[in-house]
């Protein structure tokens, strides 16, 4: 990467305030800026770093008004955070693409391998698998029998995709993720538990990103489905027969129990937990560690365990620290009431 501030502004449909010819070759956080770096300011909490940063240019919102003099070059754009994402996507697309099959990889003879695919060292592609154009399988990836991988999809090292699963186009699956392992299905009997065969699969639609060590279990029958545009963080667990609606995002350690369904455009914070067989509507926001035991209507914002409306949870959180003292006061009041009753009783006699 090496661009002038003016080239970046032109690409982002922005304007330059300062030196349009300053050359930029790397990104840096505004508080850790260095010469030759581009930073961004999208959160007012970080504004004080703008006046001391060593970065040679900073992306700011079009309407940003500095409170002090600024030494660095400003690139004004409609939305600094979105602009940064656009620019980083451009830089990422300029990286050289790996191609070819490593000599230590195994690709079954039945697999039709597009010329521009990459299959890394010790990767294994099973019989009947289908690989789309431009896909990349990094070292030690396992692709099971009958699996389809769409065009431009990237499977990073040690990703495992079990038999019969389907991965869409332009997906990114990070290291250690497991797609299509057996769901947790056991029938109790007199001797313990009998395993229920998990005969379904997992379908991951286009433009999905899945974090490291995330697990998505195959359905008992039919499919566990991750719809288009979903983004899953690391260490997410999605059980059998679940579905996640388009463009929903999960932070780390979200867990969905079996046969639960989440709508479109939802946002779940870290360690959210869903019990089985519930439905969450569209555009639902759940704060970190929220626990759901029942269905949730579209447009809801919940927090706590069990989850409750945000306003109620905030009010309750003010009361929680006072509960021990309140309990003591109630006990004292109960004692006093009991004594008063006894006095009244004696007075009647």
UniProtKB/Swiss-Prot annotation:
Its EC number is 2.3.1.191. Keywords: Acyltransferase, Lipid A biosynthesis, Lipid biosynthesis, Lipid metabolism, Repeat, Transferase. The keyword DNA damage does not apply. GO terms for molecular function: N-acyltransferase activity. It catalyses: a UDP-3-O-[(3R)-3-hydroxyacyl]-alpha-D-glucosamine + a (3R)-hydroxyacyl-[ACP] = a UDP-2-N,3-O-bis[(3R)-3-hydroxyacyl]-alpha-D-glucosamine + holo-[ACP] + H(+). Pathway: Bacterial outer membrane biogenesis; LPS lipid A biosynthesis. GO terms for biological process: lipid A biosynthetic process. GO terms for cellular component: membrane. It comes from the Bacteria. InterPro entries: Hexapep, LpxD, Trimer_LpxA-like_sf, UDP_GlcNAc_AcTrfase_non-rep. The active site is at residue 240. CDD domains: LbH_LpxD (cd03352). Pfam families: Hexapep (PF00132), LpxD (PF04613). Homotrimer. HAMAP family: LpxD. Catalyzes the N-acylation of UDP-3-O-acylglucosamine using 3-hydroxyacyl-ACP as the acyl donor. Is involved in the biosynthesis of lipid A, a phosphorylated glycolipid that anchors the lipopolysaccharide to the outer membrane of the cell. Belongs to the transferase hexapeptide repeat family. LpxD subfamily. This is UDP-3-O-acylglucosamine N-acyltransferase. It comes from Porphyromonas gingivalis (strain ATCC BAA-308 / W83).
């Amino acid at each position: 990467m090496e661009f002038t501030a003016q080239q970046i502004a032109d690409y982002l449909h922005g304007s330059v305030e300062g030196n349009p010819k300053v050359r930029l070759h790397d990104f840096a956080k505004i508080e850790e800026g260095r010469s030759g770096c581009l930073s961004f300011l999208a959160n007012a909490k970080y504004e004080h770093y703008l006046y001391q940063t060593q970065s040679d240019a900073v992306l700011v919102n079009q309407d940003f008004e500095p409170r002090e003099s600024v030494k660095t070059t400003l690139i004004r754009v409609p939305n600094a955070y979105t602009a940064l994402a656009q620019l980083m996507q451009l830089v990422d697309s300029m990286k050289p693409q790996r191609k070819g099959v490593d000599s230590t990889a195994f690709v079954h003879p039945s697999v039709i391998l597009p010329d521009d695919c990459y299959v890394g060292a010790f990767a294994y592609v099973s019989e009947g698998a289908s690989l789309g154009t431009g896909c990349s399988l990094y070292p030690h990836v396992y692709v099971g029998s009958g699996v389809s991988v769409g065009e431009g999809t990237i499977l990073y090292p040690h990703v495992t995709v079990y038999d019969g699963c389907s991965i869409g186009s332009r997906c990114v699956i990070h290291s250690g993720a497991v797609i299509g392992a057996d769901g947790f299905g056991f029938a109790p009997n007199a001797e313990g538990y009998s395993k229920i065969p998990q005969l379904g699969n997992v379908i991951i639609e286009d433009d999905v990103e899945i974090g490291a060590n995330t697990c998505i279990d195959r359905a008992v029958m039919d499919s566990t489905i991750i719809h288009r545009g979903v983004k899953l963080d690391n260490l997410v667990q999605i059980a059998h027969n679940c579905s996640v609606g388009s463009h929903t995002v999960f932070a780390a350690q979200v867990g969905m129990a079996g046969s639960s369904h989440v709508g479109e455009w939802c946002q779940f914070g870290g360690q959210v937990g869903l019990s089985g067989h519930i439905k969450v509507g569209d555009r639902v926001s759940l704060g970190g560690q929220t626990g759901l035991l029942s269905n949730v209507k579209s447009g809801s914002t919940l927090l706590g365990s069990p989850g409750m409306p945000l306003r109620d949870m905030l009010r309750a959180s003010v009361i929680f620290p006072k509960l021990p003292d309140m309990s003591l006061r109630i006990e004292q009041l109960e004692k006093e009431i009991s004594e008063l009753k006894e006095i009244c009783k004696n007075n009647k006699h």
